Amino acid sequence: MSEHDYWQVESSVYGGVGYAPATLEEYAAIAKALDDEAAGFATIATAWESAALQLQSHRHSAPMCVTLQSGDPSAVVPGHVTAPYAALGNRCYDHATACQRLSDDLRGAADLLIRAHSLYSQAEMTARRMFTELLQAGTQAKPGYAAAGVAAVAAGGFLAGWTIDGKPNPAWMSTFTYPFQEGVLSGAGGIIGGVPIGKSIAHTDEVNKAAGKIANFSGPAKDVVQGNHLDVREVQANADVVRASGSVAESMENLRRLAEERLGKIELNSGLEYGTIAIQRYERSDGTNSWLVTIPGTDGQPDSPFGWAQNVELMSADQERRRKADSARMVAEAMRQAGIGKDEPVALIGHSQGGIVAATLASDWAEEYTIEHVVTAGSPVANHPIPQRTWVTSVEIDDELVAALDGAANPVTDNWLTVQGHVSPAPAATPSTVHSDGSCTPGATPITGLTPYDAAPVAGSTNGRELSHWIKYHQAAYQNATDLGSPAVQRHEAHFQEVINGELKETRYYQGRMTQSTTIAPGERTTEFSTFGG
């Protein structure tokens, strides 16, 4: 690959409320009819190609005949007459190409219909669950073989990626191993969590049980190193980082801006640092408030509540342990300081650890806040006990690894929708050009596909493959799901917009820091939980 590689994401939709079963059956029948017609035109294309080959064979059946060999009627030899074989052959190939193009268009339309309306999603999820359970049982029975097998596939991916990129690139290891990640991780979780083989069929929370056991040791160890005193204070931004939002897509863009600004990936000169979240208050036409909380992911700083160790506590199957996670405590305290009322509607959006925090708040702070909608990007939240009244929109990439750390697929329910994206190479973007006469040709970011709905381009370029855990990949996945016209996505989008409907009145930023001391600066608040013996 080159120094400027471009990517696209093709999405599939699972869960949510689509059309009635009878309507889905009609769509399935239409998709099948389109696929059947595509197969028919493919057969015709093959027949035309065969005819062209037969004509060519007939031309060469008499090697001593100059006129027949040339296939040109103008090459007249007295006493000989020939058909225009060259022209006939070309016409056959033209017909074959046209029929194949029709076949591809029809098959593409069927595929778009299937993806937009999740026509076979139930069968896909059932097969995925069975495969995961088999891998889990195999991992528990023969953990050494499972580890060796995954390591071999990862090594093969590493070598293949080295060949493709021309340099060593570990990102390819996740690309090659993603079909096995959930099953092997759930198997490892079963071993650590002490779940017997076979008894896990009715459950999917093996990883969470294992995380709970690990957190009993990692939590106290983290407190010794980092401290357990959490200071939360409001900070001011010098730039408009998180702007007004009226949709999931706009909120994801704000999430990306805040996440990359605090990590130094972009420079908005806001002055915001790591461990920072945003809380926005929207005022509705009736004077009531609604709220949107934007929560970036792990930053890994030594005194940040969004460190690596907090992920383990957030993933625990134990509610008390989850509530002790510093990042969850930090967001809950910021929401309290912002003045969010118990009965005021709240939407949460988070990436990676931020999404796990959002799911934890929806699960474990349900009595304190009215959390109506949660949007997660690349977050392993399949086993969080989010109440039915809360809508969940999860966006994941199949090979990003992080979203698979829960060892299970997300629930497929009316209120829980998952957009799963698949990354593939895209054509290079074309820059804008200004011509000598002053006219301008705008640049374009093309995709590989027959229609604009086949995939959505990922913003920017890369130098080879990279982990698809960056928010820009989730943005492309959600864009493609939206472009498909999925009724389930449309309903979730409408619900999210309804929750935050109103005029943006304020955007406030809150920063969290972990300390060993209870001494706090003016305007700061501190919260502390004992992680020993509790």
Go through the PLM ranges and name each one.
Residues 25-32, 36, 209, 336-337, ...:
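Polar/charged alpha-helical tracts
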Residues 108-127, 187, 396-404, 431-437:
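A short, terminal or domain-edge coil/loop segment
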Residues 137-348, 361-370:
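Long, composition-driven intrinsically disordered regions
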Residues 296-329, 334, 340-341, 368-373, ...:
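Lipolytic serine-hydrolase domain surface
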